Design a protein with these regions (language model features):
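Terminal, non-globular segments
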Residues: 1-196
Length: 196
């Protein structure tokens, strides 16, 4: 029990640090049509579905602080964007706690959840979309004309970040949660009481 706990949080710490280092050092050289996918939101999307809302918020807050310190464009913009978009998107895409799932099962209010891989990609793309909308709004409020090139670059960033998430989520989820083991499913059988 304790080994799994330590392993899971060690992987979370390494994922957070390596995600930031790769975003700053490697991703600027991996431009696709002049657009760099946002690796930080890929990591945030994966952490949101694999670890839950609270840990995703802490990773988003950490990334926001680091980006605010390293790239101080607008006062507290990166800090607010990374932490708040992570928090709001995690409500829609994070796994529900077991208590909530059991409560919904008892009161017959079950809803079908999307698969984890799809929720991860959608969470990443929604985070990136909100980030790009805020950036384009900031360009507009700064007095610059927003052109179709700005909008196309924003859309390209959302798509490329979603594709990067699709590529990276499986190896990272295996590192976090381990390989999925198939277990035999027990079939329900009627209970028979004997008179003895």
């Amino acid at each position: 029990m304790q080994t799994g706990f330590v392993r899971k949080y060690t992987v979370l710490l390494l994922l957070t640090v390596l995600g930031y280092l790769f975003e700053v050092c490697v991703m600027p050289y991996l431009k696709i049509f002049g657009v760099t996918p946002n690796l930080l939101y890929v990591v945030i999307g994966i952490v949101t579905v694999a670890y839950g809302k609270l840990r995703a918020f802490w990773v988003g807050l950490t990334y926001g602080l680091l980006m605010q310190i390293m790239i101080p464009s607008v006062t507290f913009l990166n800090l607010a964007l990374y932490s708040l978009t992570t928090l709001f998107c995690s409500f829609a895409f994070a796994d529900k706690p077991l208590k909530t799932l059991e409560y919904e099962r008892v009161v017959n209010r079950q809803r079908k959840e999307l698969p984890a891989w799809l929720r991860t990609v959608l969470c990443t793309m929604l985070n990136t979309l909100i980030y790009e909308i805020v950036q384009i709004t900031y360009i507009y409020l700064g007095g610059s004309a927003v052109t179709a090139a700005h909008i196309l670059r924003g859309i390209a960033d959302v798509v490329f970040t979603g594709l990067l998430c699709l590529l990276l989520q499986y190896p990272i989820r295996i590192a976090i949660l381990g390989r999925r083991r198939t277990r035999p499913v027990l079939r329900p059988a009627p209970v028979v009481f004997s008179k003895n």
